[in-house]
Amino acid sequence: MNSSHESLADVLVKICGIKRPEDAILADKLGADLLGLIHVERSPRHLTGRELEDILSLIPPEKAVIVLEPSDPVEVAEVIERTGVERVQLHSISCEDARGIKRVLTENGFNPGITVAVPPEPGSLDVLDHIPCSCVMLDSSSGGRTGGTGRMIPPELALGMLRLIRSHESAPEVALAGGLGPSTVRLNPEYLLEFDCLDFNSGIEAAPGIKDHAMMFELMEYMGRTGGLQKPSRLQRGELS
């Protein structure tokens, strides 16, 4: 999940849940390190195969992360083969799922960067013993499924889980998700120093799947990078004007 970047802290910025071309283009221009594209049908930010390909054509391939919640390990290999993406983010997978995904990827000769999303529960880290991942993402869960809740993880719990993950023998990078927005990083500056990546989705939206361009600019300005863009004289929700 490594990517070259300069900011006020050594932390990657991922803007996830991108559904509209204009949001993808702005996120890239503002200097986001990673752009998350959700290919999960239960999500209001779900991209169909065609929509996924359309967005991928607009952004640097090294920034693309496809978010999956596979019901079958073969789905992961199929998406990688179809899109050529270098990074995938896996949600709601069990240890058995992880073993199956590892086997299928190996059989097909794929070696993507893998992020595994887990809830802030110590037992959730067992999955790390069954699949090679470069990053673990802490995210809230509901009904046994990680992500999509928009709920923030309490800071003390998030930082405690961070330390626990750091002690794992695989020593993966650690990302934090769940309702993060500009105010989150202002109120919790330790996140900028402790986590390897911060994932912003619902916290910078006007509505599900519609990014608020004013909030995106505010976030990236605070992070010390706006891709050289000047703040427009008038910012409207969902669009620059």
Swiss-Prot record:
Signal peptide: none annotated. Belongs to the TrpF family. It holds the Pfam family PRAI. Its EC number is 5.3.1.24. This is N-(5'-phosphoribosyl)anthranilate isomerase. Pathway: Amino-acid biosynthesis; L-tryptophan biosynthesis; L-tryptophan from chorismate: step 3/5. GO terms for biological process: L-tryptophan biosynthetic process. The keyword Isomerase applies. Gene3D superfamilies: Aldolase class I. GO terms for molecular function: phosphoribosylanthranilate isomerase activity. The keyword Transmembrane helix does not apply. It catalyses: N-(5-phospho-beta-D-ribosyl)anthranilate = 1-(2-carboxyphenylamino)-1-deoxy-D-ribulose 5-phosphate. Keywords: Amino-acid biosynthesis, Aromatic amino acid biosynthesis, Isomerase, Tryptophan biosynthesis.
